[in-house]
Amino acid sequence: MATWANLGLQDSSSPLMEQLNFFHDHTLLILTMITILVGYIMGMLSFNKFTNRFLLHGQTIEIIWTVLPAIILMFIAFPSLRLLYLMDEINTPSITLKSIGHQWYWSYEYSDFLNLEFDSYMVPTNELETNGFRLLDVDNRVVLPMNNQIRILVTATDVLHSWTVPSLGVKVDATPGRLNQLNFLINRPGLFFGQCSEICGANHSFMPIVIESIPMNYFIKWITSMTN
């Protein structure tokens, strides 16, 4: 989860988020190199006294500053397109989870099992346990098995919402009358926190998301206890 004064991204908990981290570092390196180059050129032009008295046109330099940015943009565009296609690819998911946004809570349905659905509200501060997370804990967590492909279907009943878990690299818009889907895999056990990322009204800040990732055998026991 995000911590105080954290300057970087959250620790990745899915292969998708690992790829997003790599792309972030790749792009930041290119931007740093451009900044240093432009700063050096500006400094060199500002502090030297040289003047070219025979300069009529700059065809060579114009070709360079047209072609070079195009090449740099290609180095950014190709990894970005690859990631976009990876995010849209859904291969035989093990479990389908449906998330429905409301003002101001989430409801979940496990489509592969009968009668398994519940609402998830934020735990108010005055009811929070000592070891709870303020404005992040919920009364009913989403329980999912680790190391399994999970498909999530997201929609809303009233206004626009956005189902977002940063450490998994997941952000899906919840649009009334429309089903959006995304595929992800959690590669370690733990609790993963997220929040609605689309302004949806007065209590937009108070509809958190909590995912509890557990091994498959414990997940089967949880499913059995919930359906019984």
Curated annotation (Swiss-Prot):
GO CC annotation: mitochondrial inner membrane
Q: Name one Pfam family in it.
A: COX2
The record's section on SUPFAM superfamilies has: Cupredoxins, Cytochrome c oxidase subunit II-like, transmembrane region
Required cofactor names: Cu cation
Q: Where in the cell is it found?
A: Mitochondrion inner membrane
Q: Which GO terms describe its biological process?
A: ATP synthesis coupled electron transport
Which sites bind Mg(2+)? E198
**Ranges per topology, Mitochondrial matrix:** 49-62
Chemical reaction(s) catalysed: 4 Fe(II)-[cytochrome c] + O2 + 8 H(+)(in) = 4 Fe(III)-[cytochrome c] + 2 H2O + 4 H(+)(out)
The record's annotation in PANTHER family points to: CYTOCHROME C OXIDASE SUBUNIT 2, CYTOCHROME C OXIDASE, SUBUNIT II
Protein name, per record: Cytochrome c oxidase subunit 2
- Which organism does this sequence originate in? Anopheles gambiae (African malaria mosquito)
